[in-house]
Amino acid sequence: MFEISSDNPASGRLLYFRSEFSLDTEPKPLGGVASLLINDVQLEINEDGRLLYVWGYCPEQSWRTAVLKPPEATGAQLRWNGRSIPRGASLRLNESGPWDILFDPIGQNLRIGSTIVGDQFVAFAPGATAELSHGSLVCLWLKLSARV
């Protein structure tokens, strides 16, 4: 479960590195100690559970091309208030199986999500918007600054 705070998210850029099949945020905000996993994409959190940035393995061979319309989102911080995660560990949020990944090459948008439709949209980190349904993450929208 997540809670929304009115503080502004960190600034930066979300990049895709083709040679590594990975996402990364530059510059990385400091303080990450653990992560939440969606597929193999990690949402880095600090000791207080605040989501800091997105990074991780996301091979473009697994993406399906689609026309996407990213949601209007409020810029805010998200805090994980679910079960405790040990320092250096990850907790998988989509335990029932991998979520589909859709990519819009025109807008450079990725959608990693379940089939559940959310009721809140929070831009919580550089290039990252969480789609929430009753406080649970149902979709991750990513806006790539560049694919290098």
PLM regions and their residue ranges:
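Short solvent-exposed loop/turn micro-motifs enriched in small/polar/acidic residues
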Residues: 35-38, 94-96, 121-124
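Mixed-charge, glycine-accented linear interaction segment located at domain edges/termini
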Residues: 118-148
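Intrinsic disorder/low-complexity detector
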Residues: 1-28, 41-43, 51-107, 148
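Short, basic/aromatic recognition patches
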Residues: 26-31, 101, 111-119
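A structural detector for beta-sheet-dominated domains
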Residues: 46, 57, 113-115, 133, ...
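Short, structured motif recognition centered on aromatic/hydrophobic residues
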Residues: 42-45, 49-54, 128-130, 137-141
